[in-house]
């Protein structure tokens, strides 16, 4: 992974913009998702929101009033940045597979190869946002492995977001003994956020 000089501002400016924009959008009418371009935008923004709000929420809960102070520590910042991108990478996979599986099951959409096209495009676009190249390459390989094994007919209803929930548990820069105590809460926090995304997708789907 490349070396980045990180600060609180660098890490959170784009991240919290996504989070706050998602909150704002909750109060305005949402248009239907009628094209693959709109689906791509949905996958990217919702994956970013879920990964960021669950990671930062967990860190804030565990660190309490010391939360902000830790962001002056370069070693900790690198750990948070590493966690952020790795969790996001798995979240992207989960939501891509879920949406295309749901499309196939409910609308008889058959061109599931477009899932790979959209997923790879999102990752390539993230280069400009400093997503580390080694994570991008590893994520593409992992996606290909999952792609070869996926059952498109059932994925959407078969614990589709467990991998990203486990990713938060794995990558969050919290002491292992504390994470062990928090395991159920951590996993549930991710699944609950995905439940919101699933509901929105089902309501907005206009294919």
Each model region followed by its residue ranges:
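Leu/Val/Ala/Ile-rich N-terminal alpha-helices, chiefly Sec-type signal peptides and the beginnings
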Residues: 2-71
């Amino acid at each position: 992974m490349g070396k980045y000089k990180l600060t609180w501002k660098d890490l959170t400016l784009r991240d919290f913009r996504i989070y706050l924009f998602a909150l704002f959008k909750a109060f305005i009418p949402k248009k239907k998702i009628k094209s693959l371009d709109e689906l791509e935008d949905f996958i990217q923004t919702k994956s970013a929101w879920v990964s960021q709000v669950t990671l930062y929420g967990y860190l804030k809960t565990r660190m309490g009033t010391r939360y902000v102070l830790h962001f002056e520590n370069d070693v900790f910042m690198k750990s948070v940045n590493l966690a952020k991108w790795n969790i996001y990478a798995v979240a992207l996979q989960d939501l891509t597979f879920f949406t295309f599986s749901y499309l196939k099951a409910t609308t008889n959409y058959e061109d599931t190869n477009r899932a790979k096209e959209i997923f790879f495009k999102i990752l390539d676009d993230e280069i400009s946002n400093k997503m580390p190249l080694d994570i991008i390459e590893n994520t593409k390989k992992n996606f290909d492995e999952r792609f070869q094994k996926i059952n498109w007919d059932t994925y959407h209803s078969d614990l589709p977001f467990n991998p990203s929930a486990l990713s938060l548990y794995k990558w969050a820069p919290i002491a292992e003994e504390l994470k062990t105590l928090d395991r159920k809460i951590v996993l549930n926090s991710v699944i609950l956020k995905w439940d919101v995304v699933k509901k929105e997708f089902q309501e907005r789907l206009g294919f």
